[in-house]
Amino acid sequence: MLSKNFLTKTVPAAFFALSLLLVTACGQQSANTQPQSAAPQGEASAPAGGEDQAGKTYKIGVVQIVEHPALDAAREGFIAQMAKNGFEKDKNVVYDLQSAQGEMSNALSIAQKFQGDGDDLILAIATPTAQAALQTTKEIPILFTAVTDPVAANLVASMEKPGGNVTGTTDMNPVEEQLKLIQELKSDAKSVGVIYNSGEVNSKVQVDMAKEAAGKLGMTIQEAAITSATEVKQAAESMVGKVDAFYVPTDNMVVSAISAVLTVAEAQKIPVIAGEENSVKSGAIATYGIDYGKLGEQTADMALKILKGEAKPADMPVEKQAEMKLVVNKLAAEKMGVTLPQAMLDRAAEVIDK
């Protein structure tokens, strides 16, 4: 039989030892059940970018001011080029594709949605959507494309040094070379009609450029300002008998309703020269300009650098497309009563005849 002193001294000690063993065992079990993906304390996380950040899904908000072939081509070129470089749609990139339907208020609401969703990057196609995105966020990187003059639009401080969270690619078209096409088609042309959206900076810049270029070529520009696509046909009709040709710049509102201009031009046998090739494919006679699909690809190359952490918008110069090409539409020329010069056909990069 144990003495009272032995029990008094020994039992508490044994209980303490047993408790210590239980606490240690529980601690080891807890450590062994930590998620395997947890990084050791103090270890830097992997840099952003496709294969370097395993398991990350990027969110890219894409907004264009309106849907028409040129802007659509820029969007599809961007997505295709991203996929070629490992950023595949619905695999490691989720695109939120939006159209503002020509309304600035819609563009602002969409940009606010992108900010609320915490998107990794915003692609703004055309000037108004880029302005809306910049107005909404100064933190999310914004890339624009199909913007004629980003400095005049107050998107960047300069073409060489944007200085903020915005950069991208410009679609500045060679206006003087395009107006020369009118003289090549109709040597006695003196007056050129230009319809444009008075609310888009992009368009005002091109009208001023057209006036300057026309002056050099011995022609004048007749302007017709509109505020909605429904006014395009009436504007074109108001110029009948006053102009020798129409010039359709890369004005998003007018391009989206170019069929209205073409209807008047074909009925009155007035040649139409466009600011970009998709308008020629839609029925204008010719253009000398850029490829919007390739412009989208070029913009994607910039996005890749941003997402991989290799560059920041503030330090990335605005890029332009180096190569221009002549595209002509033989069927459109026939409908407008114009004979295409053989010299123009011979140097064309693309001839549309069906």
Question: Predicted segment positions?
Answer:
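Hinge/cleft segment of the Venus flytrap/periplasmic-binding protein
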Residues: 308-354
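Hydrophobic alpha-helical segments within soluble ligand-binding/sensing domains
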Residues: 150-189, 291-311
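Structural motif
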Residues: 94-116, 224-239
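Beta-alpha junction/loop-to-helix N-cap segments that form part of ligand/metal-binding clefts
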Residues: 100-157, 248-266, 270, 275
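Bacterial signal peptide processing site
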Residues: 27-30
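C-terminal motif of bacterial Sec signal peptides marking the signal peptidase cleavage site
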Residues: 21-25
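An alpha-beta-alpha
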Residues: 60, 78, 167-215, 318-332
